[in-house]
């Protein structure tokens, strides 16, 4: 099914024409919803600290999670104490939940589990972004909130919008759902504060980001094995665009005996993965690793990657955060 969807969205499959009437209906519904917020008929909750929303206008992976981790580290390096909120996609969360390092991906979602495992950032997950943001502020002394994937959740007031685009797949056929991959029209890119292009050329007023492999690490934190870079591996990826991960492995000189793409947010079974690997080294993404660490074998590995952005991006982002923070502090003191 996913293969057919990709052909429709990214390869010009003629079935897209049959879906266009539904895309028109989707456009109408989303336009009405935006208008309700713009006209004040639905309320937007403003928060006392800067809110950065990191999202995309397409369905599927684009590199949001590495971008969120980059922002956490950048803000910390410059004296801020950021916190993160997320939906916790794939997890059955009642109300809101504080994410801890011992939480499983099944309990909090794979992206939140990965973000906290990497950064130990204060993080709260839940279905309603406003509730998660309020819980984060009540529980932790954070001075910036990063919302992981909430661009279309307009009830949450935001000060900075950052959109991440897949530089290889772009906006696909540029149609709205379901005929294309767009959640909102391409015009939305002209309204956000920052557009980050992951792994592709950036246009004027956009910023290029590269995901740089940093290390091959064991999925099982107690494993004592040493990775052999000359031994072919079985590669797997349960992300929005598995082919990108397999290409990265090949570029790193890692030989692939077999590659297998799973659905995004796939829940894994130990026996299925053991059968897939067949005693060979198994290589996966960091996002997959947090879902497999409790039952990982000695020769299971993941490739850690770090986002790289330009100093110009850093300067503009920090300047914007400082400006918003100063304005909100002045407002709270009646200045």
Swiss-Prot record:
Reactions mediated catalytically: a lipid A disaccharide + ATP = a lipid IVA + ADP + H(+)
GO molecular function terms listed in the Swiss-Prot or TrEMBL record: ATP binding; tetraacyldisaccharide 4'-kinase activity
Keyword match Lipid biosynthesis: yes
EC number(s) stated in the UniProt entry for this protein: 2.7.1.130
InterPro entries in the cross-refs: LpxK, P-loop_NTPase
Coiled coil: none
Swiss-Prot/TrEMBL keywords: ATP-binding, Kinase, Lipid A biosynthesis, Lipid biosynthesis, Lipid metabolism, Nucleotide-binding, Transferase
Domain of life: Bacteria
Enzyme class: transferase
Pathway: Glycolipid biosynthesis; lipid IV(A) biosynthesis; lipid IV(A) from (3R)-3-hydroxytetradecanoyl-[acyl-carrier-protein] and UDP-N-acetyl-alpha-D-glucosamine: step 6/6
Binding site for ATP: 58-65
Claim: ATP-binding is one of the keywords in the record: yes
A GO CC annotation given for this chain: plasma membrane
Gene Ontology terms: biological process: lipid A biosynthetic process; lipopolysaccharide core region biosynthetic process
UniProt-listed HAMAP family: LpxK
NCBIfam families on file: lpxK
Family: Belongs to the LpxK family.
Job of this protein: Transfers the gamma-phosphate of ATP to the 4'-position of a tetraacyldisaccharide 1-phosphate intermediate (termed DS-1-P) to form tetraacyldisaccharide 1,4'-bis-phosphate (lipid IVA).
The protein's name in its UniProt record: Tetraacyldisaccharide 4'-kinase
Source organism of the structure: Shewanella sp. (strain ANA-3)
Gene: lpxK
